Amino acid sequence: MTSSAADADYQALVFDYARSGDQDATAPVRHRVIIVGAGPVGLATAIDLAQQGITTLLLDDDDRLSTGSRAICFAKRTLEIFDRLGCGHRMVDKGVTWNLGKVFFHDEPVYSFNLLPEGGHGHPAFINLQQYYVEGYLLERAKQLSNLEIRWKNKIAALTQTDAGIALGVETPEGSYTLHCDWLVAADGARSAVRGLLGLTSEGQTFRDRFLIADVRMDADFPTERWFWFDPPFHPNQSVLLHQQPDGVWRIDFQLGWDADPVAERQPDRVIPRVQALLGRETRFDLEWVSVYTFACLRMDKFLHGRVLFAGDSAHGVSPFGARGANSGVQDADNLAWKLGLVLKGLAPQTLLDTYDSERVYAADENILNSTRSTDFITPKNEASRAFRDATLQLAKDCSFARRLVNSGRLSIPSTYADSPLNTQDTDDFAGAMVPGAPATDAPVRIGEQDTWFLRQTGNAFTGIYFADGEELSVERWKALRSLSESPTPVSLLLVVANGLRSKNTDSANILEDVEGLVAKRYDAKPGTFYLLRPDQHVCARWRSFDADAVHSALKRATGHLGGSRAQH
């Protein structure tokens, strides 16, 4: 790319096809891992593997990034993953931050909600950011990694696999060539070519409704909130969603009904009056992008097929209500990359990848359930359902119990893998949400004189968190803690102390001051408490007192060396 990060028009960039030396090799070149698809999921997976030192090849059949109406809502958990990949700050700096949402029935506000009601978190509940910016920032991060190669205009046209590996037929503007690989990650979207070549399908429910997306550039004084209308006077008997993107662009979704003509509804003479009815005829705006879509909630039966792993839209799909598509895809990458990295390094058995399948199938089912419920509430299919919905909305203004029933899209939250075989079950009493399998939560900390965030000190490796009391650690305790870094799968050690304290004789260990006491509070920790986090920042074990043998056993379990390979749900 020739444009700078500050002024790149990511929708206009074209990436030149370049002939690879693999195309001139006398025999097919073998790669350890090949990823198909340079969208957010493929790029995130490739960056994660490359950061682990795994030489990675990424193939894409196009020569440009996404354009127009794609994902725009990126959740707090996804931003934390982007932090770990080295580009989260760029997303937040560019994106429109929001925590608040409002729901209207007709033209009356029913209630508002705050998706991040407590302070002390490094990121907001959501940012709105066009997908082409997300892809652009990920791509620029990828280009910083010398062991990550991207080949544009390389299309997968054939695929065969055996127990020993995979052979790919690749089409380019200069003809076809063959590649071999140990593992293939299919992140090539809802119309996955890899899935088709294997004769696999996604099954589920297609919803009989149509929606119009209008991305509108305008100067407006709307607050940076998510506004959702049921049956508004400017668009009767349907729903409308409005929220802001960067660059003065606003996303407006209009429900149209199944009988709407998708071609006619995209025409400006249809779109402009709808937008004017919402904004007022005096508001000046330009149409940036218009599309009409239908959607389905579906998934593959399983996400691991031999040596092929499916992630993102190639594996599962949901309705747009709740921003669960791109966010769940990035969380697929987060779950997959550390496991595949350990397998490729010989530090874990191949059966560890079975837990990618079981954990992320479980997450997909959660997302599909929530997405389906949202869709059923937003688009009632009969008079009884509509009567229930409208009565709920009428009550919600004054009755808190009814607000819990209003569903304008249950917004994306990460899954807790409570039944994962990688967890070591509690033997001590704990309170709170940080159970084994839960995504770790954030809190403010201080390192030396620098204020920072707890989660930014974790990830990319197993992390041990010891809550100290500021007193001198015994030689035996310190030696046992330090031994974790010498295990076959090393553990990065963090010591958490109360504000203003310093643990003594801890050499170069990272000492985190719990400046507001929120780390201890959110993890229900006391002096001596120890947590073990996975490389994807999910809790896998915790104890009230440190026991080196127990931690080493938990580490073996979390890397697939103990117990079964599949979670039961």
Task: Give short role names for the model-derived ranges.
Residues 152-166:
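A conserved short coil-to-beta-strand element within the FAD-binding core of flavoproteins
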Residues 38-39, 131:
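Glycine-rich Rossmann-fold phosphate-binding loop(s) that bind the pyrophosphate
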Residues 29-31, 174-183:
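Core beta-strand elements of the Rossmann-like FAD/NAD(P) dinucleotide-binding domain
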Residues 10-12, 246-248, 262-328, 348, ...:
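FAD/FMN-dependent oxidoreductases across multiple families
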Residues 50-70:
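Glycine-rich FAD pyrophosphate-binding loop
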Residues 2-36, 51-52, 105-108, 136, ...:
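Helical substrate-recognition/capping region of FAD-dependent monooxygenase/halogenase enzymes
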Residues 67-143:
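Active-site-adjacent segment of FAD-dependent monooxygenases/related oxidoreductases
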Residues 109, 140, 145, 183, ...:
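Conserved FAD-binding catalytic core of PHBH/FMO-like flavoproteins
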